[in-house]
């Protein structure tokens, strides 16, 4: 081979060749590097072989490892089920092969000058002296040559369900293209979507004739032969064998390969291995045969040609031989004249006295007696002698079906086998169908569209690049795996593996949950509530009061509520008006006896404690409509009085409580509703021990702020779900880690995040501050007063922790804070700052993260790194333990209570720090979210986050608060008995003689007294019986606070207690690699308490005390 390269290639034309078989070659003008050019001739199969060689030799350039790196051009795929050796197909391929050749020679030299490419374009002897064929007068015009290219179309006459994988299902009225006809009666057809085998008896020609179903000869001595060599690789029986119409007029003899029992009067049964004479063949799978002097129909797949019958046939081939290259050309035989100039290779023609079969004769329906099972309906002759013709004429005159006719097939007879095995015959055609069938309806169309499923970057000139999810219009499908599509205004070839089909979406059903965030966003703004759903367990819904204001219903998400198996509604949120029907309340599965559950549900309808969690946007004049409820307190629990369960609530008051509105967010994203969940809430699982003592409660809520929503309503749902008779096991583990407030996307932005952009001014800001303040009570405090001065650190912490989270008391409250330590941000939305700089607080959230501005930078920072520059509140408290009944309408008392609460939380935070600094180092706090509530924050670096200081854990605060008289650090070892759960340890204040706030202690039974007037802050419920000395503030997150005086705690009692805190577990807990497991009733000593709800404890029951982190809501103070 001379070494010369190819400079240019151009495909100019196609040419038909008949040696060795009919095919087309492409005329290619090749320009070589030696400035010579030649015309070479290559057929498509040669291009295909070249492409395979190149792809095998250059896998990387062929895109086998990475499709994006493919530079080898694409070649049009092979045509497997259509005729490829026709001129029209060759002309369609010409443009693509020309592009392929041009791109191939422009590839890098290692490919374009490879041995395979040069050998392909090398001039061969056949290219210099191409074979010359004498076409004579065979082709007068190009029209005749393109006639066989069009596939015949048939209409499906009845529905057909596929029986095997190689078959396809059909629907009546559908139009199919017949690709291959088989003598077994199974045809290979193509629909708009798929190809496969179907019984021919389910198809009817669109022209109404059935002449194309039969194999026949119109002259004696002709041999009809089918060849489809290029499809042999599909491993199917593509050939039917030769059919000879001898001058001796002998019927062909076949041997039965399987026994057949006749199913009708016109059929012939036979045993296996017998010889039968085939009188007539057709392509529907049923042949007319003669056996033992009887004639009838038999399945063609049960018959096999006798081998000894082939030799005499060859000897008697004296007439012209007609070679038909494709089964589709058989239909042309009956449409031609006596001599077809197109396909005859010899001009010899024999004449016989045998008559020719006309087209009209083939299509005539045959009469048949109605009592017959299945009748032949079409006469089709297949080159028979005069004796056979006489037999047919004689059979026509009889009423019995003896004529060789195509039996119409009953579609319901679907005992079919595999088209590959061809053992079972196809169903017979029903006589009633015949040609009296009405015109079948149009095929049903299913509106579908194509779309891209991934991004694709094309590296070829006629390719197309696209992104995932784009709509694509498929213009042409290529079997090689490349489709010509249009995306937008561009067209090009795209890999079919990147394109998928889907049903065209209906605009009225575009409520897919795919775009819904998996994490519920913060609660939306709540307008003035006119009505809320009644309790789901009670089954009674309250009627909405008449009000022109609209109520925005909370959206519901596919997130389960804490500790419940709820039936969640996936409907999007809809605005509710005062006259809109209430949705069905959500049902929860509460593990308790039904009676107890019902009592709790009914009590929840008007519980003042539950009303604390409902919207604070109520008018003061609604006080007159508030009913009385009895609440029982013992130790740390509460329970509704059973004698008042049936009282219900006024359906026309705004006191109707939403029990099934929305499960609060338990997710991995950490939205705002998620951070409202505290271990204090879980403590409520052990509430409600007895029903012996009760006290009357009144509640009222003032409408202050229209921009806040009481998300702690969801906490109340959990509390209601607990059993009132038995101590329930905790169903929710505490949240060990606070996930910070994420910067929200526009679709998830709520009113609290909008406040950062549109800060409230004037009275609106005051209302927001007051509303937030009323909702944010952290613990209830019953503090006997003795005025004492707290240290600066206590005051600072008090304002930061308690007052600061409320957003400030008034407009003149200081918004400037000073950083106490350096902080490095862990996310983009946070703000890093050094120690000792002044920052301006733009938004305060109770989650423990504030949005501040430092210079020109803004971002979220933890509150424990900030201290106020100017203090506006004094934490001095003046209150007597034996004071008379508190005037609940007094503003001074409310302020005093809030100051007490601030002091409690400040002392608690300070002492938490002291306690952790004094205690021994403990293992790292579990970083996983217990109960699946929150995604653990990945930023747990020790120095910057300061886990021991509660950073990122402000949303989950200590279980209970006991304010002991603070002691100097040096006296801590003396007053060890003053500590209760999460109590202060070594605060900077002096010891006071008054009692502190305690939650876990037993309360004295006090006779509840009715109170007629209630004046409280928005979002709180304060009730005091006669004889009580201290007002109570109900905690915002739902922890019940006793309304009676606590048992006095004397100074000596506090002193004589030791530092050792022993708790007992109230339920079994399975530990893991980060936490310690224990069984119910295990005694544990608390070594360290973390405000996020995890306590570091030591087991006291075993010989070797195990240590580890345990959830605090599984523990109860050992009495």
Curated annotation (Swiss-Prot):
GO annotation terms (biological process): neural crest cell migration; reactive oxygen species metabolic process; superoxide anion generation; superoxide metabolic process
Cellular compartments per GO CC: anchoring junction; cell projection; cytoplasm; podosome
Gene Ontology molecular-function annotations: phosphatidylinositol binding; superoxide-generating NADPH oxidase activator activity
Domain PX: 4-128
Key words, A-Z: Cell junction, Cell projection, Cytoplasm, Phosphoprotein, Repeat, SH3 domain
Subcellular location: Cytoplasm; Cell projection, Podosome
UniProt xrefs under Pfam families: PX, SH3_1, SH3_2
Repeat found in the keyword field: yes
Membrane spanning stretches: none
Residue stretches making up the SH3 domain: 149-208, 249-308, 445-504, 812-871, 1058-1119
Subcellular location, principal: cytoplasm
Chain intervals with Basic and acidic residues compositional bias: 581-590, 688-718, 806-815
Biased composition (Low complexity): 779-802
Post-translational events: Tyrosine phosphorylated.
Region annotated Disordered, chain positions: 388-429, 494-595, 641-815, 914-941, 957-1004
UniProt comment concerning the protein's domains: The PX domain is required for podosome localization because of its ability to bind phosphatidylinositol 3-phosphate (PtdIns(3)P) and phosphatidylinositol 3,4-bisphosphate (PtdIns(3,4)P2) and, to a lesser extent, phosphatidylinositol 4-phosphate (PtdIns(4)P), phosphatidylinositol 5-phosphate (PtdIns(5)P), and phosphatidylinositol 3,5-bisphosphate (PtdIns(3,5)P2). Binds to the third intramolecular SH3 domain.
Function: Adapter protein involved in invadopodia and podosome formation and extracellular matrix degradation.
Family: Belongs to the SH3PXD2 family.
UniProt name for this protein: SH3 and PX domain-containing protein 2A
UniProt source species: Danio rerio
Lineage, broadest ranks: Eukaryota, Metazoa, Chordata, Craniata, Vertebrata
């Amino acid at each position: 081979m001379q070494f010369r390269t190819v400079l240019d290639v151009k495909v100019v034309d196609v040419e038909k060749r008949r040696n060795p078989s009919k095919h087309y070659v492409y005329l290619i003008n090749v320009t070589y590097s030696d400035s010579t050019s030649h015309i070479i001739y290559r057929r498509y199969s040669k291009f295909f072989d070249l492409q395979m060689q190149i792809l095998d030799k250059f896998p990387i350039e062929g895109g086998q490892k990475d499709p994006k790196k493919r530079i080898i051009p694409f070649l049009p795929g092979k045509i497997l089920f259509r005729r490829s050796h026709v001129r029209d197909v060759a002309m369609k391929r010409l443009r693509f092969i020309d592009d392929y050749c041009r791109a191939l020679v422009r590839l890098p030299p290692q490919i374009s000058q490879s041995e395979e490419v040069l050998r392909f374009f090398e001039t061969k002897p056949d290219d210099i002296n191409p074979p010359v064929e004498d076409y004579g007068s065979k082709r007068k015009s190009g029209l005749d040559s393109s006639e066989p290219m069009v596939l015949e179309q048939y209409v499906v006459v009845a529905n057909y369900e596929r029986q095997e994988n190689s078959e396809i299902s059909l629907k009546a009225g559908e139009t199919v293209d017949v690709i291959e006809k088989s003598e077994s009666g199974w045809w290979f057809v193509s629909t708009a979507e798929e190809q496969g085998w179907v019984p021919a008896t389910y198809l009817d020609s669109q022209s109404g004739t059935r002449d194309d179903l039969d194999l026949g000869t119109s002259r004696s001595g002709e041999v009809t032969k089918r060849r489809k060599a290029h499809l042999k690789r599909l491993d199917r029986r593509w050939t039917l064998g030769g059919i000879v119409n001898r001058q001796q007029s002998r019927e062909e003899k076949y041997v039965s390969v399987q026994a057949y029992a006749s199913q009708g009067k016109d059929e012939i049964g036979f045993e296996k291995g017998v010889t039968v004479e085939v009188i007539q063949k057709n392509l529907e799978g049923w042949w007319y045969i003669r056996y033992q002097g009887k004639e009838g129909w038999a399945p063609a797949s049960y018959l096999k040609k006798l081998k000894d019958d082939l030799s005499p046939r060859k000897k008697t081939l004296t007439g012209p031989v007609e070679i038909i290259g494709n089964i589709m050309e058989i239909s042309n035989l009956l449409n031609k004249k006596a001599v077809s100039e197109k396909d005859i290779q010899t001009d010899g023609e024999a004449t016989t006295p045998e008559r020719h079969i006309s087209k009209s004769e083939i299509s005539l329906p045959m009469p048949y007696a109605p009592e017959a099972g299945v009748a032949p309906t079409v006469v089709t002759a297949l080159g028979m002698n005069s004796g056979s013709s006489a037999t047919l004429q004689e059979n026509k005159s009889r009423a019995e079906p003896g004529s060789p006719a195509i039996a119409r097939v009953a579609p319901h007879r679907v005992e079919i086998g595999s088209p590959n095995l061809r053992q079972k015959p196809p169903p017979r055609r029903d006589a009633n169908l015949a040609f009296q069938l009405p015109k079948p309806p149009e095929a049903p169309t299913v509106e579908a569209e194509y779309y891209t499923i991934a991004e694709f970057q094309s590296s070829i000139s006629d390719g197309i690049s696209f992104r995932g999810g784009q709509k694509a219009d498929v213009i042409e499908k290529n079997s090689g795996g490349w489709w010509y599509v249009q995306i937008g205004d561009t067209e090009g070839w795209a890999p079919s593996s990147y394109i998928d089909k889907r049903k065209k979406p209906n605009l009225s059903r575009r409520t897919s949950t795919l775009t819904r965030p998996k994490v519920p966003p913060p609660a939306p703004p709540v307008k003035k509530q006119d009505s809320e759903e009644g309790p789901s367990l009670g089954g009674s819904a309250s009627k909405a009061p008449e009000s022109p204001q609209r109520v925005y219903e909370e959206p519901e998400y596919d997130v389960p509520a804490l500790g419940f198996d709820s039936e969640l509604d996936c409907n999007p949120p809809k605005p509710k008006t005062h006259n809109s029907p209430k949705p069905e309340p959500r049902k929860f599965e509460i593990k308790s006896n039904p009676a107890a559950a019902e009592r709790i549900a009914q009590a929840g309808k008007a519980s003042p404690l539950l009303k604390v969690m409902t919207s604070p946007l109520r008018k003061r004049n609604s006080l007159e409509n508030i009913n009385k409820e009895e609440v029982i307190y013992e130790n740390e629990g509460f329970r509704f009085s059973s004698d008042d369960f049936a009282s219900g609530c006024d359906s026309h008051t705004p006191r109707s409580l939403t029990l099934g509105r929305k499960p609060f967010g338990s997710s991995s994203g950490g939205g705002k509703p998620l951070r409202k969940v505290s271990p204090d809430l879980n403590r409520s699982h052990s509430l409600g021990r007895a029903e012996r003592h009760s006290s009357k409660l009144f509640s009222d809520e003032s409408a202050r702020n229209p921009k806040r929503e009481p998300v702690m309503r969801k906490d109340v749902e959990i509390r209601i779900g607990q059993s009132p008779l038995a101590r329930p096991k905790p169903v929710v583990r505490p949240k060990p880690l606070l996930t910070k407030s994420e910067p929200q996307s526009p679709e998830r932005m709520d009113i609290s995040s909008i406040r950062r952009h549109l800060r409230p001014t004037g009275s609106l800001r005051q209302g927001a501050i007051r509303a937030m303040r009323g909702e944010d009570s952290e613990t209830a405090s019953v503090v006997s007063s003795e005025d004492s001065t707290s240290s600066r650190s206590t005051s600072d912490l008090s304002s930061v922790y308690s007052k600061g989270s409320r957003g400030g008391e008034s407009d003149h409250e200081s918004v400037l804070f000073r950083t106490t330590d350096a902080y490095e941000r862990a996310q983009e939305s946070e703000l890093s700052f050094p120690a000792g700089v002044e920052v301006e607080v733009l938004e305060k959230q109770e989650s423990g993260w504030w949005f501040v501005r430092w210079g020109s930078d803004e971002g979220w920072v933890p509150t424990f790194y900030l201290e106020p520059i100017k203090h506006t509140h004094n934490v001095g408290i003046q209150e007597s333990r034996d004071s008379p009944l508190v005037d609940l309408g007094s503003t001074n008392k409310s302020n005093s209570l809030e100051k007490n609460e601030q002091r409690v939380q400040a002392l608690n935070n300070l002492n938490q720090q002291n306690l952790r600094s004094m205690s021994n180092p403990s293992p790292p706090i579990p970083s996983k979210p217990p109960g699946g509530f929150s995604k653990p924050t990945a930023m747990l670096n020790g120095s910057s986050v300061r886990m021991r200081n509660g950073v990122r854990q402000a949303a989950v605060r200590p279980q209970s608060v006991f304010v002991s008289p603070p002691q100097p650090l040096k006296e801590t070892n003396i007053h060890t008995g003053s500590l209760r759960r999460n109590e202060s340890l070594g605060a900077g204040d002096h010891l006071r003689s008054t009692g502190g706030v305690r939650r876990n202690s037993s309360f004295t039974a006090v006779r509840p007294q009715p109170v007629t007037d209630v004046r409280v802050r928005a979002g709180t419920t304060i009730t005091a019986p006669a004889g009580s000395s201290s007002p109570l503030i109900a905690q915002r997150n739902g922890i019940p606070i006793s309304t009676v005086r606590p048992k006095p705690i004397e100074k000596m009692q506090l002193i004589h207690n030791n530092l050792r805190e022993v708790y007992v577990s109230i339920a079994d807990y399975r530990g893991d690699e980060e936490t310690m497991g224990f069984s119910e009733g295990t005694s544990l000593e608390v070594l360290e308490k973390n405000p996020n709800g995890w306590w570091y404890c030591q087991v006291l029951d075993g010989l070797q005390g195990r240590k580890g982190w345990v959830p605090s809501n599984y523990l109860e103070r050992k009495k």
